């Protein structure tokens, strides 16, 4: 059994909310996307991606393929749909989105993701980031772990995405599978949340309450209070 709640806020500085999320406890499926593109195209790309993932998982024949493969296929399907829409409509040219999708079944956590929306796992009181950001700074730190992170964080390319759904000629869908236990908590966020809170603060909020609704509300409220200038989305799912 999984208890989950999600919350999204357009934030302190944005006119529109281009974040989208989905919670389907019957499918043990959770999705967060952060769209990009002018004229509301970002929210279109994010919603298309969320819809494609949910539809693909619902259509899965019993016993067919692993959840990780299924999630990968669903995101690839979203890529095709977004690129087709961009070719049909000039206003959608260049639109894209990040996405992180997770499914829990039979003691296994399956995750597929693109971009810098994140999934964290809280297990036995310890918080760990499961996904890895597809950003310029993450690429630089991966190639040179001894690099000056503080200096890189002030570089103008710091948060530029190196991978996105639909917005680039090629998209790489990353997948992760690992064991999960009763009592573990999943946290999925867009950068409007995790860019203004470190892992210590995120863990503190996750440990302060057992109710996913309260936790999600506190996460978004805290991000806004810390001056987040982006849309803020948090999904919290507790395995029971």
Segments and roles (model prediction):
Residues 1-240:
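PP2C/PPM-type serine/threonine phosphatase catalytic domain
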């Amino acid at each position: 059994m999984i208890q989950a709640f999600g919350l999204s806020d357009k934030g302190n500085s944005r006119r529109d909310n281009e974040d989208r999320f989905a919670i389907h406890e019957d499918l043990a499926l959770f999705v967060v996307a952060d769209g990009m593109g002018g004229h509301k195209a970002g929210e279109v790309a994010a919603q298309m991606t969320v819809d494609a993932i949910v539809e693909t998982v619902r259509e899965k024949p019993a016993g067919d393929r692993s959840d990780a493969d299924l999630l990968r296929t669903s995101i690839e399907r979203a890529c095709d749909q977004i690129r087709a829409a961009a070719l049909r409509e000039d206003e959608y040219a260049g639109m894209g989105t990040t996405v992180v999708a997770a499914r829990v079944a039979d003691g296994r956590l399956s995750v597929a993701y693109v971009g810098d929306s994140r999934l964290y796992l809280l297990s036995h009181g310890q918080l760990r980031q499961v996904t890895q950001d597809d950003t310029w700074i993450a690429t630089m730190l991966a190639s040179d772990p001894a690099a000056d992170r503080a200096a890189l964080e002030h570089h103008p390319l710091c948060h530029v995405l190196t991978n996105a759904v639909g917005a680039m000629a090629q998209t790489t869908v990353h997948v992760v599978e690992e064991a999960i236990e009763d009592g573990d908590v999943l946290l999925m966020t867009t950068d409007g949340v995790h860019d203004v809170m470190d892992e210590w603060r995120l863990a503190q909020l996750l440990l302060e309450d057992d109710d996913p609704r309260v936790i999600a509300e506190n996460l978004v409220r805290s991000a806004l209070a810390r001056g987040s200038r982006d849309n803020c989305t948090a999904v919290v799912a507790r395995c029971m």
